[in-house]
């Protein structure tokens, strides 16, 4: 069968396995040429390792100088009668192939990161492959739901404003349409559920588990990813349910920092730049900002994807420095290039002009959509998309 791109709204319903491999190789090539991580960690656990920042961090730490061995946890779908499976499934497979070829250990654990069974599997893998200890734990889950303990019910996250409704534009990638949407404010219950799913509680629970099983090495660090953004994004992001969850994550980093101080380690929330990811295209009213930001940062030569952000994080912030540089709230900031005042002034100017008629010319819509397609293995020049791929071949690939 031939695998074609299939998009519903802002959700990709297909992924191209060999395109996913091309994406992995492209990111590996970038970090091999970039400034090297000199004093990085050797044994890394990534919770949420199959796409976005988690995957980019895994690639950077393995191929960008640190030569790390990794255990990656993710919840992904393999091939079946229903379809070829998710991009993350193939990212896991081809990352492992490349890492193994380079002489590195790469263990993939596919399952629900909130479950006890997956935690037990991770502890066992740390014992087996890492001599019982990890040097770095990266928490990069982008889940929409979290099971309630000892129950059949779930907490569900929502992307909504708090207090008052917000009107803004979303862009449906399926048909390249600009759609005005109004989001009603979240209820208190919805805001609390979003904190449960996307806040710091599960991150802290993972670190507690690792401490209690004596799986934390001397000097062990942990990071989780956050976003704050400029004022124009605050109504839907920082002042909304997502922002509440991220503030909870920031507070958790301080509690974990105290716990890891016993091991001469540390915990940090890392504030990243706005990017096209599987998660970010879901956020209403963020798309026009991304189009304007991509255009301005590319024109200035400061644009970064996940992989550039992660390589810079490990070489200039988390490692290779006498001390981890943080802001007044003890956050690592790699959103500095995005929030440059001149960049933001130019972005604001574009947003004032942007509308349903001109968004493709006014912003970098082509770059925005291209990046989305590449998340799912499409739009790579060196991949033959006309080739037939059998489900049996795909089923033989194991993460």
Swiss-Prot record:
One of its GO terms (molecular function) is enoyl-[acyl-carrier-protein] reductase (NADH) activity. GO terms for biological process: fatty acid biosynthetic process. The active site is at 237 (proton donor). Keywords: Fatty acid biosynthesis, Fatty acid metabolism, Lipid biosynthesis, Lipid metabolism, NAD, Oxidoreductase. It comes from the Bacteria. Substrate binds at residue 227. It holds the Pfam family Eno-Rase_NADH_b. NAD(+) binds at residues 48-53, 75-76, 112-113, 141-142, 246, 275-277. Belongs to the TER reductase family. Involved in the final reduction of the elongation cycle of fatty acid synthesis (FAS II). Catalyzes the reduction of a carbon-carbon double bond in an enoyl moiety that is covalently linked to an acyl carrier protein (ACP). NCBIfam families: EnoyACPredFabV, PRK13656.1. This is Enoyl-[acyl-carrier-protein] reductase [NADH] 2.
